[in-house]
């Protein structure tokens, strides 16, 4: 599907939901390299680094108002991937885009269930971030 122009989006989550994508066909599609074990930063990032303010995912968002990006899955960007947001201390990616065949891929390494990212979910631009991600991978 992605190879012919579809999309793939990966979101981090609870350890019980661990994707364990390493070594699977999904691992090949993702714009990140994932570990073969559960590897997280549960401390999070106080102020994430916006690497590309002009990227369509970042467009129109008040990143200065995002004071905290909670815990995240430790991954590394795949060759040719584009890191939109990162942890300034570890330099690990938080939001990464890539391509696979004719399609687009996105990895959001944080959580969405409110545990890790309770503060991020309260960010006024959080809904728009996901609209931007959906629009990016759909185009």
Model-predicted segments: where are they?
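An acidic, glycine-rich "communication" segment
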Residues: 3-89
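Extracellular ligand-binding/catalytic regions of CAZymes and related secreted enzymes
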Residues: 78-82, 89-92, 99-104, 110-139
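Generic intrinsically disordered, low-complexity segments enriched for polar/acidic and small residues
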Residues: 18, 66-69, 97, 123, ...
């Amino acid at each position: 599907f992605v190879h012919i122009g579809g999309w793939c989006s990966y979101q981090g989550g609870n350890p019980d939901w661990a994707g364990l994508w390493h070594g699977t066909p999904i691992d090949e599609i993702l714009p990140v390299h994932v570990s073969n074990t559960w590897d997280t930063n549960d401390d999070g990032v106080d102020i994430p680094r916006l690497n590309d303010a002009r990227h369509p995912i970042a467009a129109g968002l008040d990143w200065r108002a995002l004071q905290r990006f909670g815990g995240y899955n430790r991954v590394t960007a795949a060759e040719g991937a584009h890191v939109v947001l990162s942890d300034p201390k570890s330099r690990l990616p938080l939001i990464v885009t890539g391509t696979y065949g004719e399609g687009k891929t996105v990895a959001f390494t944080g959580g969405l269930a409110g545990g890790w990212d309770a503060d991020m979910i309260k960010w006024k631009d959080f809904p728009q971030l996901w609209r931007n991600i959906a629009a990016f991978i759909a185009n």
